[in-house]
Amino acid sequence: MKHLQRFFSSDASGGIILIIAAALAMLMANMGATSGWYHHFLETPVQLRVGALEINKNMLLWINDALMAVFFLLIGLEVKRELLQGSLASLRQAVFPVIAAIGGMIVPALLYLAFNYSDPVTREGWAIPAATDIAFALGVLALLGSRVPLALKIFLMALAIIDDLGAIIIIALFYTSDLSIVSLGVAAFAIVVLALLNLCGVRRTGVYILVGAILWTAVLKSGVHATLAGVIVGFFIPLKEKHGRSPAKRLEHILHPWVAYLILPLFAFANAGVSLQGVTIDGLTSMLPLGIIAGLLIGKPLGISLFCWLALRFKLAHLPQGTTYQQIMAVGILCGIGFTMSIFIASLAFGNVDPALINWAKLGILIGSLLSAVVGYSWLRARLNAPA
């Protein structure tokens, strides 16, 4: 029992459970005895009805759209705290992850196009390596435990959130043809209500969660990635302490174990089960998967490192406190873990063209993300162990 308590109290435990869940999913998805059960579980329909409102989704989409909104709520709370009271409190520190994210989206997309520009079909997947899977990136970072400077973790979270916002904008502009204006209007109204609650000094977390549920539903119905609602709600929950209590910090403390030990492992289990059936060397060495692998493994760290160097060179930003440029480069490699967001963009880019393209894209995403995780972890571990 003491060993179990020690494990769950360690900073690395969440990352270890995440990796185990992902490995289990890969194993089950590729074994004849379990693949049927695995896919049946993900495709199980779950219906939610409140009056005239009805939401029909399978288990996979409930995990990705609903449970992950809770994860993004926690991320929003943590980033807000650092923006107002922590390592991102100055303008030059706050702008650093923004500049990094821009580089981390532009360069991978250009590198992918260098491989696929001559093919008008695969060219449509240019945004696939521009995405970062914040959950898996943080999971790998967590494996290094308390050795990771808090400012570096916050930098990764802020960078990945901006990256995700960029991916959502790209999806809305280039891959979505049926945005619901009415639902977007309801979402905008809910955001105004959240802002008014904050300005009026309302400190009851439940009120924000209730309005947040309306916002989540509206964003979901609009055709935009619903997890965005979680970040927005997190930004509006009050951080200031009153009588020694902060609603944002209290909610952050409550959510952390649920996210680390239930939501993220479940997310990994639901999304990591990529089938390797039908994989051939010819397909693996085609321009589509090679472009994705190059974009994630080379383009991501190159874009982030280059733009960060330019920001520092021209004194537009500062390094996060207690970090080094080498550590920033390692985070850039970890941002090459595109995984679920990349798979989502691939399904939009090729879903109406050829299912085989989606399979090759998934394989490229899996290889690129896995290599980024291994190289990024090894690089950062070496940088953390190096003498200052």
Curated annotation (Swiss-Prot):
A biological-process GO annotation: regulation of pH
**Keywords for the protein's UniProt record, in alphabetical order:** Antiport, Cell inner membrane, Cell membrane, Ion transport, Membrane, Sodium, Sodium transport, Transmembrane, Transmembrane helix, Transport
What Gene Ontology cellular-component terms does the record carry? plasma membrane
Q: Which reactions fall under this protein's catalytic activity? A: Na(+)(in) + 2 H(+)(out) = Na(+)(out) + 2 H(+)(in)
- A Pfam family cross-referenced in the UniProt record is Na_H_antiport_1
Spell out the disulfide connections. none
List, alphabetically, the Gene3D superfamilies matched.
Na+/H+ antiporter like domain (1.20.1530.10)
Topology relative to the lipid bilayer, per the entry, is: Multi-pass membrane protein
Taxonomy, superkingdom: Bacteria
Coiled coil segments of this chain: none
Compartment list: Cell inner membrane
Keyword Ion transport present in the record's keywords: the answer is yes
Matching PANTHER family, A to Z? NA(+)_H(+) ANTIPORTER NHAA, SODIUM ION/PROTON ANTIPORTER NHAA-RELATED
Q: Which family does it belong to?
A: Belongs to the NhaA Na(+)/H(+) (TC 2.A.33) antiporter family.
Q: Give the protein's function.
A: Na(+)/H(+) antiporter that extrudes sodium in exchange for external protons.
Q: What is this protein called?
A: Na(+)/H(+) antiporter NhaA
Q: Which organism is it from?
A: Salmonella arizonae (strain ATCC BAA-731 / CDC346-86 / RSK2980)
